[in-house]
């Protein structure tokens, strides 16, 4: 059994870590480096940093904080936001990031996934998918979700896009379930299972974790990692206690 990963997500905006609910009303959560160091020292397996405004504002991620994070932690981390070219990715990887994740730029230029995979290896290339479930249960891919003024339906369905990004060379998929984001009432297991069934690469669940049981429910579907933000930032769940709980439930977890 592959070891399951517990991942903390740090949404970055204007040089600070923020957190919203359903991708809206972002509140300040603290300093990037301090939080990165805290998570590294408290048992998290991996960190994902999303510069949530970079793509919407057509900005680049600040290389300075990426480099500082790399100097201050000893765990794997992934960076996302505004990565539109091989040059952008190369700079972030050179500054210490282990992986890069693309979301809106991949929707605008799907060949970017293939180019990045060829340049840096599929293990470095994560595709983030912001998936919204409408009132009829249809799963739709949204883009530019870091700013509610720019957030819009991309015209693509989630399941079709999941298949497509794998064909193009994605090494991992993070499924951001927008309806669940920050609500803490559990991952959307129905959506997660539908995506998992067509996923041949590692799948990470994002959006909805509120208690330890929610992580267990998601992992029981077979996914590789579970990502959360609110419950970790607000210290509602202790990471080490969560890992012990999951290990006691029979999962392969790094303690």
From Swiss-Prot:
Keywords: Amino-acid biosynthesis, Cytoplasm, Histidine biosynthesis, Lyase
Enzymatic reactions: 5-[(5-phospho-1-deoxy-D-ribulos-1-ylimino)methylamino]-1-(5-phospho-beta-D-ribosyl)imidazole-4-carboxamide + L-glutamine = D-erythro-1-(imidazol-4-yl)glycerol 3-phosphate + 5-amino-1-(5-phospho-beta-D-ribosyl)imidazole-4-carboxamide + L-glutamate + H(+)
Keyword Cell inner membrane in annotation: no
GO biological process entries: L-histidine biosynthetic process
Oligomeric form and interacting partners: Heterodimer of HisH and HisF.
PANTHER family found in the cross-reference section: IMIDAZOLE GLYCEROL PHOSPHATE SYNTHASE HISHF (PTHR21235:SF2), IMIDAZOLE GLYCEROL PHOSPHATE SYNTHASE SUBUNIT HISF/H IGP SYNTHASE SUBUNIT HISF/H (PTHR21235)
Family matches, as HAMAP family: HisF
Name of the molecule in the record: Imidazole glycerol phosphate synthase subunit hisF1
Gene: hisF1
């Amino acid at each position: 059994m592959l070891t399951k990963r517990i991942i903390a997500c740090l949404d970055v905006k204007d040089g600070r870590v923020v957190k919203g609910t359903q991708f809206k009303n972002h509140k300040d959560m603290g300093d990037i480096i301090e939080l990165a160091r805290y998570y590294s020292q408290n048992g998290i397996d991996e960190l994902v940093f999303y510069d949530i405004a970079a793509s919407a504002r057509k900005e680049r991620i600040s290389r300075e904080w990426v480099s500082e994070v790399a100097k201050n932690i000893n765990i794997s981390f992934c960076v996302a936001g505004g990565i539109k070219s091989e040059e952008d990715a190369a700079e972030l990887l050179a500054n210490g990031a282990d992986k890069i994740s693309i979301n809106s730029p991949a929707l605008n230029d799907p060949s970017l996934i293939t180019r990045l995979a060829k340049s840096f290896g599929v293990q470095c290339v994560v595709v983030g998918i912001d998936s919204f479930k409408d009132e009829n249960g249809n799963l739709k891919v949204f883009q530019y979700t870091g700013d509610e003024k720019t957030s819009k339906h991309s015209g693509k369905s989630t399941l079709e896009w999941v298949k497509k990004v794998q064909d193009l060379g994605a090494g991992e998929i993070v499924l951001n379930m927008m309806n669940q984001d920050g609500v803490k009432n559990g991952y959307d297991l129905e959506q997660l299972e539908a995506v998992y069934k067509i996923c041949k690469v590692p799948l990470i669940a994002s959006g909805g974790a509120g208690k330890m049981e929610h992580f267990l429910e998601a992992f029981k579907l077979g996914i590789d990692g579970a990502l959360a933000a609110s419950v970790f930032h607000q210290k509602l769940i202790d990471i080490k206690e969560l890992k012990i709980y999951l290990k006691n439930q029979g999962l392969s977890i790094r303690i």
